[in-house]
Amino acid sequence: MDALLTSPFIPLKKPSHNRKSNTTTASSSSSSFLQLIPQTKKETLDFDLPRYNTLISPTLDLAVVGGGPAGLAVAKRVSDAGLSVCSIDPYPNLVWPNNYGVWVDEFAAMDLLDCIDASWNSASVFIDDNNRKLLSRPYARVDRRRLKSRLLNAYLSNGVRFHQSKVLNVVHEEAKSVLLCSDGTRIPAAVVLDATGFSRCLVQYQQPYNPGYQVAYGILAEVEEHPFELDQMVFMDWRDSHLGFRPELKKRNDGLPTFLYAMPFSSDLIFLEETSLVARPGLLIEDIQERMIERLRHLGIRIKRIEEDERCVIPMGGPLPVLPQRVLGIGGTAGMVHPSTGYMVARTLAAAPIVADAIVGYIGGSGAEVSARVWKDLWPIERRRQREFFCFGMDVLLKLDLEGTRRFFDAFFGLEERYWHGFLSSRLFLPELVGFGFSLFGRASAGCRLEIMAKGTVPLIKMIRNLLKDLE
């Protein structure tokens, strides 16, 4: 508790949002708020980015495919070391569309507190109508404009080049790889990094890819009012009293539950997201929207304007990419999504220096040698073992209905903070995770223990088998 309370805290401030919209500003009942969804607005940053010269094309040290946070962070650090870098993306000036939430201590550890635009000194978890847990761990929303602007400013100082196109394929030679772009451009580079996220543009997978899916629908909305405290965000709300008069919807939610995640910025501005934690196959967005409509109606939230809406489909778990391979990966394309939670932003930003420093340190050898060394640094055995445990957690969660999920999180958030903090932030490794598992089992109710034993035995055997196989 003491460690948490001394974490850096950014006082809550109302972020700047553009209130101009083509949509109606009339209040909407929850049942019709989807009518207020604005047309997709693509916000761009005003940077004059230096372009890659297609006429003079010496082999680059690094070509980064994709312009998300992790890819830009790697490119920035590699260019800091004086290496030549090109970032290839169809929309290099575009502001990232999704709202990213992080624990404040995660961004503090990376000296990124200036890239937060709102924060809350605590978070709440509603297990059910009679059980609410208060998490004394500051939480924040990432300032997408500021984070990308910070990285692009460094790019300009370091001489990074940009090419606005989509990469279609890559051809490997012994000492370099050549990227083939949709506009016909060929870009040679000693090292290629695929940072395209879940599209997995270039990174190869051999095993059958059958992940779980986290599916969510969210809105940034101006509302008449909402019932949430302004100094707390809602991390999870598993209550289902809003479905009392919708028996068919309640039955679906009993089997495949969803929860509400909410970030209140002011008394009339809030981000609301209905989320399926993990399911296989993933839930339909329309199903999630229907549940969200009923929840907002029950909470008395009337939407006046929707400023943004987002639809997230996040693959979780599944096999790692082929290790090693010539194309490097980071983030979603490298299997770095937390298989039990869907978290990725802080983890991948923290991994960016590892990948970048490995590239800088190993470049100069053959393409295959460099790639093999970098992949080894990104996925050392302790990280692979950690991921196997997280996949075990995901496999258990896949089998839980609403009541089982409630019992699980009642025990989870009742653990010592070092355990649930470390689990959510990928800071626990296998010996600590074993301790986490025993502690969770000991904390759980009798019903939860029986369920873990009944539904976790097969996933546990699978995890042990994979851990032993990784030693071969």
Curated annotation (Swiss-Prot):
Residues 1-27 are annotated as: Disordered. Gene3D superfamilies: FAD/NAD(P)-binding domain. It is an enzyme of class 5 (isomerase). One of its GO terms (molecular function) is intramolecular oxidoreductase activity. The keyword Glycosyltransferase does not apply. Residues 1-25 form a transit peptide. Expressed in flower buds and lips. Detected in roots and leaves. It catalyses: a carotenoid psi-end group = a carotenoid beta-end derivative. NAD(+) binds at residues 62-90. Its EC number is 5.5.1.19. GO terms for biological process: carotenoid biosynthetic process. Keywords: Carotenoid biosynthesis, Chloroplast, Isomerase, NAD, Plastid, Transit peptide. Pathway: Carotenoid biosynthesis; beta-carotene biosynthesis; Carotenoid biosynthesis; beta-zeacarotene biosynthesis. It comes from the Eukaryota. It is found in: Plastid, Chloroplast. Catalyzes the double cyclization reaction which converts lycopene to beta-carotene and neurosporene to beta-zeacarotene. Belongs to the lycopene cyclase family. This is Lycopene beta cyclase, chloroplastic. It comes from Oncidium hybrid cultivar.
